[in-house]
């Protein structure tokens, strides 16, 4: 029966270090796109809900990822990523 190899490959960074680095990257990106008061309020909400726990960190990461994804998908003014806004004919003449 096959067994998984033990400790082969490069050593992985500890989960908590990786998580905190990811959170810092997301926060620095979010500050470029959203008002600081919104982000501060989000942080306060997370802190009130989860306290100072890893669950709160994970929740904040998840929410920031979702906010940034939607922001870019809708069409950030600073980015080329997103939906291109096109004018549509009202009579449907552009449909094939």
UniProtKB/Swiss-Prot annotation:
Disulfide bond annotation, renumbered to this chain: none
GO cellular component, one term: host extracellular space
Domain of life: Viruses
Region (Homooligomerization): 1-42
Pfam families named in the record: VPR
Signal peptide: none
Entry annotated with the keyword Phosphoprotein: yes
Sequence positions bearing Phosphoserine: 79, 94, 96
GO biological process: DNA-templated transcription; monoatomic ion transmembrane transport; protein homooligomerization; regulation of DNA-templated transcription; symbiont entry into host cell; symbiont-mediated activation of host apoptosis; symbiont-mediated arrest of host cell cycle during G2/M transition; viral penetration into host nucleus
Subunit structure and binding partners: Homooligomer, may form homodimer. Interacts with p6-gag region of the Pr55 Gag precursor protein through a (Leu-X-X)4 motif near the C-terminus of the P6gag protein. Interacts with host UNG. May interact with host RAD23A/HHR23A. Interacts with host VPRBP/DCAF1, leading to hijack the CUL4A-RBX1-DDB1-DCAF1/VPRBP complex, mediating ubiquitination of host proteins such as TERT and ZGPAT and arrest of the cell cycle in G2 phase.
Family per similarity comment: Belongs to the HIV-1 VPR protein family.
UniProt protein name: Protein Vpr
Gene name, Swiss-Prot/TrEMBL: vpr
């Amino acid at each position: 029966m096959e067994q998984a190899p033990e400790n082969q490959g490069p050593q992985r960074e500890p989960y908590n270090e990786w998580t905190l680095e990811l959170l810092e990257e997301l926060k620095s990106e979010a500050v470029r796109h959203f008002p600081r008061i919104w982000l501060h309020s989000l942080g306060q909400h997370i802190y009130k809900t989860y306290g100072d726990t890893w669950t709160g960190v994970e929740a904040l990461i998840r929410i920031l990822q979702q906010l940034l994804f939607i922001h870019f998908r809708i069409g950030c003014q600073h980015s080329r990523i997103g939906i291109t806004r096109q004018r549509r004919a009202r009579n449907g003449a552009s449909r094939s």
